[in-house]
UniProtKB/Swiss-Prot annotation:
Residues 78-105, 258-297, 497-526, 610-677 are annotated as: Disordered. This is E3 ubiquitin-protein ligase SH3RF2. Residues 263-285, 517-526 have a biased composition (Polar residues). It catalyses: S-ubiquitinyl-[E2 ubiquitin-conjugating enzyme]-L-cysteine + [acceptor protein]-L-lysine = [E2 ubiquitin-conjugating enzyme]-L-cysteine + N(6)-ubiquitinyl-[acceptor protein]-L-lysine. Residues 370-459 are annotated as: Interaction with PAK4. It comes from Homo sapiens. Residues 125-184, 187-252, 380-441 form the SH3 domain. Signal peptide: none annotated. Has E3 ubiquitin-protein ligase activity. Acts as an anti-apoptotic regulator of the JNK pathway by ubiquitinating and promoting the degradation of SH3RF1, a scaffold protein that is required for pro-apoptotic JNK activation. Facilitates TNF-alpha-mediated recruitment of adapter proteins TRADD and RIPK1 to TNFRSF1A and regulates PAK4 protein stability via inhibition of its ubiquitin-mediated proteasomal degradation. Inhibits PPP1CA phosphatase activity. Residues 641-646 are annotated as: Interaction with PPP1CA.
Length: 729
């Protein structure tokens, strides 16, 4: 019988009054209240059933009571007393079926003062439920509203902070902090979804036979945690271990992994790492005699990042991740180690491809400057982001971010929030979407100088960069790309000259060595005191490349001789494979020589090096002095005009051949020339700085001049007894 039939039995068919425990059941099984039976017997002098007219021969008092009615009435009384006693139901409430009937026929239920409620203490013991700790009115249309003390039936757990529940037949969402869970929901099985393909069987079958092979989007059952970076799972009928960073666990699996993390920390201390002497990037793990299974090693965050980088650079249609033998790095050392790749044959078009953000260690007195080197053929998946600002987590489910930190986004959590994993710490959490920005959104052009460097970053020491920055941003004059070659990089300490025009200032020049790879990534310096200068495949020249040649300065026609910017070439070996060496330009506001009286002190021998000249800047460019090699690009000799610096005697009119001499280099005197004279000079004027010891040593350089060159015009400078000669027609 349904609820409505049971409720009809509570009414007397004759007087329609409510029945109680004194009601009597006749032999025909019809039940009436006792007062109605007494009135019928008094009126007719006999007792017959008012429904079927069946005669009743026994006394009214001897008739039995309806046991079903008694039980129903007892249930009503127990339900009312339970509601007043603070049970899971409020007074006057009904079961779920009663709530549905109230929506279909509310008037009939309101007319009846009784509610049919079963014994809830017996039936609700296994039902997941929670008790409200405070009043909650909700902020969104889908939120559940309740008062303090209400009992809410739990339907499912949305995440760590939200539940979906039901009260009085109304479902909605509510925060977990507003209720006290009385009976927990049944936990789903610990599962995780594969984010990438994982297969190490082809690498080394003997070493990786215990690894679990899976494909992307496979669902794996998590069994336990092996160590900090590996877990044991089951896929189908296969059981094995797999890297945790390759999967996305659900809430149950995450709790299981976190619970076992503390237990495994003591076990990982007993594991010994044996590095291979033949290979610097592979290691094996020594297994103890009593271990149950072989653990291939701690799959560190560094190895995962390198694997992600290889996946990023793979073709877009490729989903298989090429995984090399895991690099075993101690989990207690989170510093990132770049694998050596000097022998890799990388084309020059791939220069500047993405590399993980690795802050290089610098000395305490040096700050760091970040240089962005974007490549022309870089492409990243859309889920790779970089933090624009630092973000501190306000809850256990949020992710701490540091400025410049890489993040892989797993998906959208809600409006304005993203869920992702940090590429530095490996933690998974949510964070605001306005704190991150996708990297490499512009792949073929350079970022604007006002925008932050969101591309592949390397860390420089400011000892190799001037205090005002020698890296020019987006110079329109330097639009032609340079070829990328292996160039020994020189380290320069720029020193501002405070001397006046009439005094002699000194600049110090310091050299260092650092290798640069073709793929744009940098090796760390062997000593923290030796800074690394970045030279990459750039469309603009960020700094100076110095070579131990005779110093040659080029000043374009129409540019005054006032010092603005100086480019010096200095090196120790010729460029490889016949490619032109990369020469970089320091702009006017960042010049290292700030007066004509400044000088440079060289510390190396002179080695002739063939190099291609720089592209000639337009005549409207700001004042600068560019390097002009001895041979022009097209091989055509043009008119050459010279300026020679000597101490006490005027230069002879014939040519001299340079001879290296030993001794202290002297500083050139201040160059004084009017702007019209400087403007009248040819576009290939060469300034020669000669090293002299004590007095005049006769050291000059061969000058190639056209046969049409006329007599030399001499201009003598009066400063410090120095004579300046300008040969011209």
């Amino acid at each position: 019988m349904d609820d409505l039939t049971l409720l009809d039995l509570l009414e007397c068919p004759v007087c329609f009054e409510k029945l109680d425990v004194t009601a009597k059941v006749l032999p025909c099984q019809h039940t009436f209240c006792k007062p109605c039976l007494q009135r019928v017997f008094k009126a007719h002098k006999e007792l017959r059933c008012p429904e079927c007219r069946t005669p009743v021969f026994s006394n009214i008092e001897a008739l039995p009571a309806n046991l079903l009615l008694v039980r129903l009435l007892d249930g009503v009384r127990s339900g009312q007393s339970s509601g007043r006693g603070g049970s899971f139901r409020r007074p006057g409430t009904m079961t779920l079926q009663d709530g549905r009937k109230s929506r279909t026929n509310p008037r009939r239920l309101q007319a009846s003062p009784f509610r049919l409620v079963p014994n809830v203490r017996i039936h609700m013991d296994g039902v997941p439920r929670a008790k409200a700790l405070c009043n909650y009115r909700g902020q969104n249309p889908g939120d559940l509203r309740f008062n303090k003390g209400d009992i809410i039936l739990l339907r499912r757990q949305l995440d760590e902070n939200w539940y979906q529940g039901e009260i009085n037949g109304i479902s909605g969402n509510f925060p977990a902090s507003s209720v006290e869970v009385i009976k927990q929901l049944p936990q789903p099985p610990p599962l995780c979804r594969a984010l990438y393909n994982f297969d190490l069987r082809g690498k080394d079958k003997s070493e990786n036979q215990d690894c679990l092979t899976f494909l992307k989007d496979d669902i794996i059952t998590v069994i336990s945690r092996v160590d900090e970076n590996w877990a044991e799972g089951k896929l189908g009928d296969k059981v094995g271990i797999f890297p945790i960073l390759f999967v996305e666990p659900n809430l149950t699996a995450r709790h299981l992994l976190e619970k076992n993390k503390g237990r495994q920390s003591s076990r990982t201390k007993n594991l010994s790492l044996v590095s291979s002497s033949s290979r610097g990037n592979t290691s094996t793990l020594r297994r103890g005699p009593g271990s149950r299974r072989k653990v291939p090693g701690q799959f560190s965050i560094t190895t995962a990042l390198n694997t992600l980088n290889r996946m990023v650079h793979s073709p877009s249609g490729r989903h298989m991740v090429e995984i090399s033998t895991p690099v075993l790095i101690s989990s207690s050392n989170p510093s990132v180690i770049t694998q050596p790749m000097e022998k890799a044959d990388v084309p020059s078009s791939c220069v500047g491809q993405v590399s993980t953000y690795h802050p290089a260690p610098v000395s305490p007195g040096h700050s760091t400057a970040v240089v962005s080197l974007p490549g022309s053929q870089q492409h990243l998946s859309a889920n790779m982001f970089v933090a624009l600002h630092s973000y501190s987590a306000h809850g256990p489910d949020e992710l701490d971010l540091q400025k410049g930190e890489g993040v892989r986004v797993l998906g959208k959590c809600q409006d304005g929030w993203l869920r992702g994993v940090s590429l530095v710490t490996g933690r998974v959490g949510i964070f605001p979407n306005n704190y991150v920005i996708p990297i490499f959104r512009k792949t073929s052009s350079f970022p604007d100088s006002r925008s932050p460097g969101l591309y592949t970053t390397w860390t420089l020491s400011t000892s190799s960069v001037s205090s005002q920055g020698s890296i020019s941003e987006g110079d329109p004059r330097q639009s032609r790309p340079f070829k990328s070659v292996f160039v020994p990089t020189a380290i320069v300490n720029p020193v501002r000259s405070t001397a006046g025009p009439g005094t002699l200032g000194q600049g110090s020049l310091r050299k260092g060595r650092s290798s640069m790879r073709k793929n744009g990534s940098l090796q760390r310096p062997l000593q923290s005191g030796i800074p690394t200068l970045v030279v990459g495949s750039l469309r603009r020249s960020p700094t100076m490349v110095l070579r131990p040649q005779q110093f040659q300065f080029y000043q374009p026609q129409g540019i005054p001789s006032s010092p603005s910017a100086v480019v010096v070439e200095m090196g120790s070996k010729p460029a490889l494979t016949g490619e032109p060496a990369l020469t970089c330009i320091s702009r006017g506001s960042e010049a290292w020589i700030h007066s004509a009286a400044s000088s440079l002190i060289m510390e190396d021998k002179e080695i002739p090096i063939k190099s291609e000249p720089l592209p000639k800047p337009p005549a409207s460019a700001p004042p600068s002095i560019l390097v002009k090699p001895e041979n022009s690009r097209n091989g055509i000799e043009k008119q050459v005009k010279t300026v020679r610096f000597q101490n006490y005697s005027p230069p002879p009119t014939k040519h001299y051949t340079s001879h290296p001499t030993s001794g202290k280099p002297e500083q050139p005197a201040t160059l004084k020339a009017s702007q019209p004279e400087a403007a009248s000079l040819g576009p290939e004027m060469t300034v020669l700085f000669a090293h002299r010891s004590g007095c005049h040593s006769g050291q000059q350089t061969d000058l190639r001049r056209k046969s049409a060159l006329g007599k030399a015009t001499t201009l003598v400078s009066t400063a410090s007894g120095t004579q300046t000669v300008f040969p011209s027609k």
